[in-house]
């Protein structure tokens, strides 16, 4: 959630940026005075992990999972990206680009820098520019999404400024994977699931949300957020198990959809007049306009959240905190809202707690005691315990890659080699091990 391009209410204070990390275990906040990281391990307390005041006007701050690797962009140098080891307070490398940096995405393989009309793909192991996607359709909001999965390492970005085409790019093999005609209107939001095999999309119209298989591009699900009014979708987010999808907008409602395929029952012969009438109604849908038929087939929200505000830009996440499912909403009003979420029953979610994003304590912020209706689930997050450190990096070595269009450089190659990504305890970053 980048707020640098819009005016922010006084209640948000100095907030310029907020985002969850890849597995929703921490929250990054950028402000006019620097940046902070908060742990999301507790509902009752927003524990500050780290605070930096050396860099002012931080409009982008992205953390790699729970490691110490952080990517930073400041309003004072909007074309410059700095990659740092925040626990040591050292800069690993920096790059400068031809235009303002609008978004930065990271996983354990790649770092993506999004400009208005180009995308830069860096190898996160040595920060070298591997590929540049040039002359993309104008993308002033920096809309893009990078899968956090190392094997299905796909990048999605708008393929058109006038209609909702999605370009899917394979960042490992550095080639286009697919073009998905997702919507009639321009895209407003994109999100991969944790496995990198599903992509959720929403258009500027905001009434329909679709989920596609990746890389095939087959439509798997279609959900209707509303009918009466068009809205601006702010955020899409899957749960870590890919069963649920949350969607927030500039309205007061957050919708949570369940990705399930309803098994069709075998047709039964009607035994009453109402049965015959129902069968006639179902048969008549084949003669209705396609738009009306689609509305009959679209899924509805499994659960909803009523936010205490309307009109603020926000981000949402479905997280597991202390083995219980929660919906998190970080908003431009300067607060993090935590709601209960019942993955079995759904329904209306209740506000449990709200925290100020500047980390300050506020009395009477507790809304609801932990309920006996909370259902424990298995932890959905990646393990991210980091203990090992490495020697501080040597001074930055600058180089100009004329064919790739980025001025900058990584630390000396032998120093970058110290970032052993095949060890779980390396800091930063780490490679996920699966059993």
From Swiss-Prot:
The keyword Transferase does not apply. GO terms for molecular function: phosphatidylinositol-3,5-bisphosphate binding; phosphatidylinositol-3-phosphate binding; protein-macromolecule adaptor activity. It is found in: Preautophagosomal structure membrane. A motif (L/FRRG motif) lies at residues 223-226. Residues 386-435 are annotated as: Disordered. InterPro entries: PROPPIN, WD40/YVTN_repeat-like_dom_sf, WD40_repeat_dom_sf, WD40_rpt. Keywords: Autophagy, Lipid-binding, Membrane, Repeat, WD repeat. WD repeats lie at residues 182-222, 228-267, 311-349. It is a peripheral membrane protein. Pfam families: PROPPIN (PF21032). It comes from the Eukaryota. SUPFAM superfamilies: WD40 repeat-like (SSF50978). GO terms for cellular component: cytosol; phagophore assembly site membrane. GO terms for biological process: autophagosome assembly; autophagy of mitochondrion; cellular response to starvation; glycophagy; nucleophagy; pexophagy; protein localization to phagophore assembly site. The keyword Repeat applies. The L/FRRG motif is required for recruitment to PtdIns3P. Belongs to the WD repeat PROPPIN family. Component of the autophagy machinery that controls the major intracellular degradation process by which cytoplasmic materials are packaged into autophagosomes and delivered to lysosomes for degradation. Involved in an early step of the formation of preautophagosomal structures. PANTHER family: WD-REPEAT PROTEIN INTERACTING WITH PHOSPHOINOSIDES WIPI -RELATED. This is WD repeat domain phosphoinositide-interacting protein 2. It comes from Xenopus laevis. The gene is wipi2.
């Amino acid at each position: 959630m980048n707020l640098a391009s819009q005016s922010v209410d006084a209640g948000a204070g100095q907030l310029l940026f907020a985002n969850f990390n890849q597995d929703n275990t921490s929250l990054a906040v950028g402000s006019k005075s620097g940046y902070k990281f908060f742990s999301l391990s507790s509902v009752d307390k927003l524990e500050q992990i780290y605070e930096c005041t050396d860099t002012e006007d931080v409009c982008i701050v992205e953390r790699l999972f729970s490691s110490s690797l952080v990517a930073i962009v400041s309003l004072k140098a909007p074309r410059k990206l700095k990659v740092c080891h925040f626990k040591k307070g050292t800069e690993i490398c920096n790059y400068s680009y031809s235009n303002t940096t609008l978004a930065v995405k990271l996983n354990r393989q790649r770092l993506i820098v999004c400009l208005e009309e180009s995308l830069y793909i860096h190898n996160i192991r040595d920060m070298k520019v591997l590929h540049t996607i040039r002359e993309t359709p104008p993308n002033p909001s920096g809309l893009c999404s990078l899968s956090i999965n190392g094997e299905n390492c796909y990048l999605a970005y708008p393929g058109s400024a006038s209609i909702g085409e999605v370009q899917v790019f394979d960042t490992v093999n550095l080639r286009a994977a697919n073009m998905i005609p997702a919507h009639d209107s321009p895209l407003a939001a994109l999100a991969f699931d944790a496995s990198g095999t599903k992509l959720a999309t929403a258009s500027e119209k905001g009434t329909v949300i679709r989920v596609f298989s990746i890389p095939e591009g087959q439509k798997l699900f279609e959900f209707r957020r509303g009918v009466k009014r068009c809205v601006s979708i702010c955020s899409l987010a899957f749960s870590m198990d890919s069963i649920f999808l949350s969607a927030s907008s500039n309205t007061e409602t957050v919708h949570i959809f369940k990705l399930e395929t309803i098994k069709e029952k075998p047709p039964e012969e009607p035994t009453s007049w109402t049965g015959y009438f129902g069968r006639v109604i179902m048969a008549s849908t084949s003669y209705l306009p396609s738009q009306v038929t689609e509305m009959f087939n679209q899924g509805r929200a499994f659960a909803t959240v009523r936010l205490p505000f309307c009109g603020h830009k926000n981000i949402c996440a479905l997280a597991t905190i202390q083995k219980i499912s929660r919906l998190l909403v970080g908003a431009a009003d300067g607060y993090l809202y935590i709601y209960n979420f019942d993955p079995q029953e759904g329904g209306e979610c209740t506000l449990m707690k709200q925290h100020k994003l500047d980390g300050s304590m506020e009395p009477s912020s507790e809304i609801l005691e932990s309920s006996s209706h909370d259902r424990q689930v298995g932890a959905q997050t990646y393990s991210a315990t980091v203990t090992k450190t490495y020697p501080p990096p040597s001074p930055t070595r600058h180089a100009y890659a004329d064919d790739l269009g980025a001025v900058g450089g990584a630390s000396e190659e032998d120093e970058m080699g110290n970032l052993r990504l095949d060890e779980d305890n390396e800091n930063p970053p780490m490679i996920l091990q699966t059993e």
